[in-house]
Design a protein with these regions (language model features):
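N-terminal low-complexity or simple alpha-helical regulatory segments
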Residues: 1-93, 107
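Juxtamembrane "helix-exit" motif on the non-cytosolic side of transmembrane helices
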Residues: 34-45, 95-105, 164-174
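Alpha-helical transmembrane segments of multi-pass integral membrane proteins
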Residues: 12-34, 86-87, 109-185
């Protein structure tokens, strides 16, 4: 429900790229929640292979988080080509895992997700510092220029990513609950 309201709010907000990216992020998260809800409500027995498939499909959202963060600190960076390339790097192992049902492709996708998230984390700290300097150089009144909130959000995203990567391999309801608590608490 929350994600659906966010989609509606950012759809009404405007046509700027950042609002549309946040709306896209909320749409993807909303669809993932609906998928999970359908699985939880059904009498379907979630075996390990299906658990991996459910988690693998959730990984396509990781680049969208990066797109939002990049648009915040480097407006205009994202193009359709860059978006397609970043998403393709997640979709290819997902498709190969779906076709072959080999756990190797799930491991590749999870490792890529972790590596991509880690590189994004450190790159964002650099870009946030650079953007902070640019803002201070551009404006004479500097008292209200503070991007520490963005560093905090970035760190929360990274912690959630770490817990989520571990939860991909832990087929356990309790560990899934821990991930949900981290997501809600951050």
């Amino acid at each position: 429900m929350f994600y659906s309201m966010m989609v509606w709010m950012f759809w009404r907000k405007g046509n700027d790229k950042l609002s549309r990216l946040i709306m896209l992020l909320m749409v993807v998260l909303d669809l993932e929640c609906l998928k999970d809800l359908a699985l939880y409500l059904s009498d379907f027995e979630l075996h390990k292979s299906m658990w991996h498939w459910v988690n693998a499909t959730d990984m396509v959202v990781v680049p969208v988080y990066t797109f939002v963060l990049m648009e915040l600190v480097k407006p205009g960076w994202l193009s359709w080509r860059k978006a397609a390339l970043h998403e393709a790097s997640f979709l290819m192992p997902l498709v190969l895992y779906g076709i072959t049902d080999k756990l190797f492709w799930f491991d590749v996708l999870t490792a890529w997700c972790f590596a991509y998230g880690t590189v994004t984390y450190f790159l964002m700290f650099y870009l946030i510092s650079r953007y902070h300097r640019q803002l201070k150089e551009r404006f004479s009144y500097q008292d209200n220029i503070n991007l520490n909130w963005l560093r905090g959000i970035l760190s929360c995203f990274f912690v959630i990513l770490l817990v989520w990567v571990f939860s991909c391999y832990m087929v356990d309801a309790q560990f899934d609950n821990i991930y949900m608590l981290f997501s809600l608490g951050a």
